[in-house]
């Protein structure tokens, strides 16, 4: 009896240990992800003119708000109520909105013709770092009509007015908040070309009188600033509209580099290398028109402010030109007009204070005003660095930001040495430490060993494919090596993380020398891209597949989702050891 019981216990322990080992070692190298239909269950309903589109979002997954696209075929869409999403931010695509829970989108139809459909595109990801290709659904519509006849040509294909559309001319968001323009305007007011003029402008606004009620003084100064703001706002709207018209051209590397050169010239003018201003004849004419206006009257003061916005001094021309070129990059007329209005308001706030309280609150003129002007030269230099970053890539962008930081903190340190005040010694230490920190990327570039630098900057030897036939051809040329197939897309955040962090690791690169590297870019989500994904039974990205020397996929080798360098290196070594 005891012997039989002992055998049963041993058998139970053996079975348990085998199960535990299976649970420990048979798990794949990547998390399990469901199909796109399981992640985002789609449904719809129609009640006459009202269509409701529904998505049931699986926990741990989310849909991108800006990726929704709804168009009608043989249907006129009256409106779409796209709800607000939850704020989301990642390193590569910045701020966006997502739907991590079930979402409904009401669509109102104006009219439909027989055979009308809605074409709906959407895209989502898993929170674990796995993204699905854009999904497209076509919804059949029942026929509805309005009281007035709709032209069939109009109803043939009507795009939905989805907020923040992805198609058509893209309206870029400004990378820096327009509120910075307010601070820049205030700073420009304290440059040597502007601040000394404020008492004179104040006297002109009041018509040479000081026996005016405080409320009237405040109103006159405010109206003057609004006139100036109107001029600048119109400038911003016109330039942003022009930028929207030529948005595609403004994104080309040649144009970006040319604009960067212009920004650098504008910055050099702030450092005193040369002066930028309107032709003297035009300035004289504008000044005469301004002087004809009657000071002390609201209409006259408003016109003086509007004309003052056109009279650019050497201190204001470069910053104004830089801001105008900057907002032209966005093509956003609202942001363009608002940015220039805030800039004018910033310049006008000190003027309102001087007009209301007199010169007592003004700081004394001195060399410090030239330092303010030079400081704005560094602000303008940040714009070409931002533009070149988009052309040269992250590595050179970081070096340029480092160079700008070293230059600014070095300038501030040299400036602080001129002051005899004791507390400036503390500030000198701060500037010096900041310059040392900012110089780190330059130090890494200058003093890194040549082998490491070349390894980091050299592109990986990927063989690019686009079709199933291309894949078969590459697998037939394996030459006894394991073939890694990397499926990449620009809309895949984790793909970019692989590219930036994992594939750049020196040990991973060294291990790659034992593999044949193949890559398919499926960003376009074309028919041949979908055929390749279907052939490989791929649900989404990132996905990396490994094939043996005979062209067969290695079991349990597929990587879905992001892996850091150490995890991925262990995976590669395990595959080679088998």
UniProtKB/Swiss-Prot annotation:
Q: Which residues lie on this side of the membrane: Periplasmic?
A: 23-180, 238-253, 328-336, 389-394, 450-578
Task: Report the top EC class in one word.
Answer: oxidoreductase
Mind listing the GO biological process terms from this record?
cell redox homeostasis; cytochrome complex assembly
Q: Does the keyword Membrane apply?
A: yes
Q: Which Pfam families match?
A: DsbD_N (PF11412), DsbD_TM (PF02683), Thioredoxin_2 (PF13098)
Q: Does the keyword Transport apply?
A: yes
Compartments it resides in: Cell inner membrane
Record-annotated membrane-spanning stretches: 181-201, 217-237, 254-274, 307-327, 337-357, 368-388, 395-415, 429-449
Gene3D superfamilies named among the record's database cross-references: Glutaredoxin, Thiol:disulfide interchange protein DsbD, N-terminal domain
A single Gene Ontology CC annotation of this entry is: plasma membrane
SS bond list: 125-131, 193-315, 492-495
User: What EC designation does it have?
Assistant: 1.8.1.8
Main localisation: membrane
PANTHER family xrefs: THIOL:DISULFIDE INTERCHANGE PROTEIN DSBD (PTHR32234:SF0)
Q: What does this protein do?
A: Required to facilitate the formation of correct disulfide bonds in some periplasmic proteins and for the assembly of the periplasmic c-type cytochromes. Acts by transferring electrons from cytoplasmic thioredoxin to the periplasm. This transfer involves a cascade of disulfide bond formation and reduction steps.
Similarity comment: Belongs to the thioredoxin family. DsbD subfamily.
Q: Can you name this protein?
A: Thiol:disulfide interchange protein DsbD
Species: Tatumella citrea (Pantoea citrea)
- Gene that specifies this protein: dsbD
